[in-house]
């Protein structure tokens, strides 16, 4: 049996990646619970993302602990990605079947594309974290240990989250200048990560941008909580205002992706040192 070094940089990176996946899955769990409750769970399949994200949170909590998550981990990560992919299909179908099809109005008010896509990311990153934690540095020709593929995938995930935030903040007419923060800072972070993936070099600027992106997720949740409080009745009327106000669960996805990006940076630093 392969011996797992629980103090190696690779294991530390696996913990960061798994921790980021926990945050993404937590965001999906809270968001899908609220939105599918709003839809009265009209389709029995609407329960699936709640179950998949809950299992993903539990399994990813063991990230970096070698085999402590057991052989169940790969199956749970695959299931999360599969449920997310199916949900993405359902949501796209829901948008296209509306009058006018793929219009801004339908993208604004119909089933969000970003939520199931985030579950795909949680499953994917969870799987990568597990492979690294058990000493598997590659998937076929893809070298996970270098951190470059992980950085590229994280940059893609950040830009997808930026697109979702941009769409919904555009719906809100960017009435608060702070609504530009999750568009600008994470975009710079994604660009820096993409460059690092191409050159195999990150640096302090990329790390600083990732830290800023993580902070944007936390600050965004606070702004959204304030937005909920501004609705009639404030937090005393939380049952209605949580559904009507800005989603509390959305911004922390930036934090999760930024933490995963830091894991990729750690792998690249280790690879550069040989």
Where are these regions (language model features)?
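Short amphipathic, positively biased membrane-proximal segments
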Residues: 1-274
């Amino acid at each position: 049996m392969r011996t797992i070094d629980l103090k190696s940089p690779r294991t530390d990176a696996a913990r960061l990646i798994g921790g980021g996946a926990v945050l993404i899955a937590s965001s999906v769990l809270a968001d899908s619970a609220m939105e599918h409750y709003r839809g009265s769970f009209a389709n029995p399949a609407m329960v699936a993302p709640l179950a998949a994200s809950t299992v993903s949170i539990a399994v990813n909590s063991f990230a970096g602990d070698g085999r402590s998550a057991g052989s169940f981990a790969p199956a749970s990560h695959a299931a999360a990605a599969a449920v997310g992919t199916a949900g993405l299909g359902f949501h796209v179908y829901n948008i296209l079947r509306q009058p006018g099809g793929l219009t801004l109005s339908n993208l604004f008010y119909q089933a969000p594309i970003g939520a199931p896509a985030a579950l795909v990311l949680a499953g994917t990153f969870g799987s990568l974290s597990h492979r690294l934690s058990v000493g598997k540095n590659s998937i076929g020709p893809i070298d996970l240990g270098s951190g470059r593929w992980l950085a590229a995938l994280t940059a893609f995930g950040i830009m997808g989250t930026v697109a979702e935030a941009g769409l919904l903040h555009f719906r809100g007419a960017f009435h608060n200048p702070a609504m530009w923060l999750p568009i600008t800072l994470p975009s710079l972070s994604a660009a820096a990560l993409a460059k690092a993936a191409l050159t195999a070099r990150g640096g302090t600027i990329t790390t600083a941008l990732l830290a800023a992106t993580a902070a944007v997720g936390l600050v965004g949740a606070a702004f959204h909580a304030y937005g909920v409080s501004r609705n009639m009745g404030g937090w005393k009327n939380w049952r209605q205002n949580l559904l009507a106000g800005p989603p509390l669960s959305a911004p922390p996805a930036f934090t999760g992706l930024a933490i995963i990006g830091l894991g990729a940076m750690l792998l690249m630093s280790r690879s550069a040192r040989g």
